[in-house]
A protein has these predicted regions:
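FIC/Doc superfamily catalytic core
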Residues: 1-298
Length: 298
């Protein structure tokens, strides 16, 4: 790889100075890589170098995916974090392929298909609904868990949420109502937690595809740089504990979507979301004025 391409490995230079096609590819790669943070994963230097080859037009996305697969198949010296990096690398490339397409099957089958495609070559259970109940200890909840849906009703619940969204009309509503509605739709879909693993990444990709499909311009940098906030905001939107005096709160997720869709600048740091935030972190500030809001074409 040349010195120039090495310099561009963080993608920022492509976003600032690249050709339009390079900017688009760099933005998608940055989003795909950033989404790995929801599970504490980091990609390898090899993945970033391969991504640059794709951005430069030297290889297509399928060739990039093949290179990554071959890299791990032929690697002789194993590192302690190879399994995690392999997952992050392969999933990032898979997400890049998905987000490079403008197609979306907005149905239960389409949602399940996104999971299958995101985790193709990574999980044996990719594209399969879970068949057991789950709990997950959350840092933002001080070790407690969200109550996820029981496994017997997963498909029925996804069917219902998507059917309700299909008939919802965005015509004539305010941007505030639009954001509130999108927040609750995405929160409800995520709370189902349809899969054994990879629910947040699947929901994020499906959300990006859906918002684009109804005419909204999505600021990919929000998912690229604040994916863990996105996950923690989903957790807070779906957690209630009467003994602790904690109710469901959508405000943190709404602020993520206000930044994403309206150009607002809420400070998206995770400490504001902790159920026992210190006084310093109790009030989440808005940093800058808004830009011109969007109206969806639906």
């Amino acid at each position: 790889m040349s010195d120039i391409k090495q310099h561009y490995t963080d993608f920022d230079e492509y976003l600032r100075q690249g050709e339009p096609s390079q900017k688009e590819k760099a933005s998608i790669w940055q989003t795909a890589i950033g989404l790995q943070a929801v599970d504490g994963l980091q990609t390898s230097d090899y993945l970033k170098a391969t991504a640059c080859k794709h951005i430069e037009g030297e290889i297509n996305i399928d060739e990039a995916r093949e290179l990554i697969t071959s890299y791990y198949q032929s690697k002789t010296q194993r590192e302690p974090d190879d399994d995690e990096k392999q997952e992050a690398d392969k999933v990032s490339a898979n997400i890049t392929k998905i987000l490079s397409s403008q197609t979306l099957d907005f149905s239960t089958g389409g949602y399940v298909s996104v999971h299958r495609r995101v985790f193709d070559g990574v999980f044996k259970h990719a594209g399969k609904l879970r068949d057991y109940d789950i709990t997950k200890r959350e840092w933002v909840l001080d070790g407690d868990t969200v109550n996820y849906l029981n496994w017997e009703d997963l498909r029925r619940a996804i069917d219902y949420d998507i059917s309700q969204e299909k008939v919802f009309s965005y015509k004539g509503i305010s941007t505030d109502v639009m954001v509130e509605h999108i927040t609750r739709f995405v929160s409800g879909l995520w709370q189902i937690h349809a899969f054994c693993e990879g629910n947040t990444r699947t929901t994020a990709v499906f959300t990006i595809l859906y918002l684009r499909s109804i005419g909204l311009k999505v600021d990919n940098s929000l998912f690229a740089h604040h994916s863990w906030y996105f996950r923690n905001a989903l957790v807070r939107a779906n957690y209630k504990n009467a003994l602790k005096g904690i109710d469901y709160t959508f405000v943190y997720l709404e602020r993520f979507f206000r930044n994403l869709l309206l150009g607002e600048k809420w400070d998206l740091r995770n400490r504001y979301l902790h159920i026992h935030a210190t006084d310093e972190w109790k009030v989440q500030p808005k940093l800058h004025p808004t830009s011109t809001p969007q109206v969806p074409h639906k």
